[in-house]
Curated annotation (Swiss-Prot):
It is found in: Cytoplasm. GO terms for molecular function: 4-hydroxy-tetrahydrodipicolinate synthase activity. GO terms for biological process: diaminopimelate biosynthetic process; lysine biosynthetic process via diaminopimelate. Homotetramer; dimer of dimers. This is 4-hydroxy-tetrahydrodipicolinate synthase. It is an enzyme of class 4 (lyase). Pyruvate binds at residues 50, 209. It comes from Synechococcus elongatus (strain ATCC 33912 / PCC 7942 / FACHB-805) (Anacystis nidulans R2).
Amino acid sequence: MPQPYPFGRVITAMITPFNAEGQVAYDIAQSLAVHLVEQGSDGLVICGTTGESPTLTWEEELQLFRAVKEAVGDRAAVIAGTGSNCTREAIAATQSAATLGLNGSLQVVPYYNKPPQEGLYAHFRAIAEACPDLPLMLYNIPGRTGQSLQPETVARLASLPNVVAIKAASGNVEEVSALRQLLPDSFAIYSGDDSLTLPMLAVGAQGVVSVASHLVGPQLQALIQAFEAGNVARAQQLHHQLYPLFKALFLTTNPIPVRAAMELLGWSIGLPRLPLVPASAEIRQALASCLTELGLYTA
């Protein structure tokens, strides 16, 4: 189906598989990427928060971009997580990613150094102008970065031709309302929280950058398409059906729970890298219960 938005409706923020020695398992990453596309993902974010970008080297990230693009080709948008709190590093990483034929780049709000809004504007503008041929998705996640990208700043950035979307992960539906009022219809807003996908659709979002789509991609596609078709009751039904899983996937720091869930479903994706640790037995049991209820898992 042709996608009306720059990266589709359902974009999976993909986990990074590791082998028993803790090295990136590129072959499993390729298999997982193909599986996710077959299960309804229109796009894949590689080396984002869920992909454990803080503990990957640049060489590992670049090889992951290559491997995933090789695996999925043109069947899905491949979006490189090349953001940084150092503008020069973000530009260099994004320029390198642009040479690989990827479809876009995810640019997180600079973390820890907490620039003011004018600094955020200058940061993203510098990246956009240095990489004019690569579409950029802004990424607002103040719970991790310590700073929020304000709607007015996003509106200024939207005037740049290759700044085409935002992942809104503040947990604030009012932010999406403000964004939609300020931005052109061509600028895509993606929910950054699975549990807020339906509420954000109601105020003007187009889709979701999802963790849960590792497990329930077809259902998320059905939810969004039902809403688009005006079948709000069906969208609500799917939302409530999936809601326990949405919450279970954030019982502790992402991506710990989704990695455990994928292991329960038979994926050999290894342990997260320190300082992240494996899911507790209690969290694994909660995930198993949710997956069983959805008909996805049998103990």
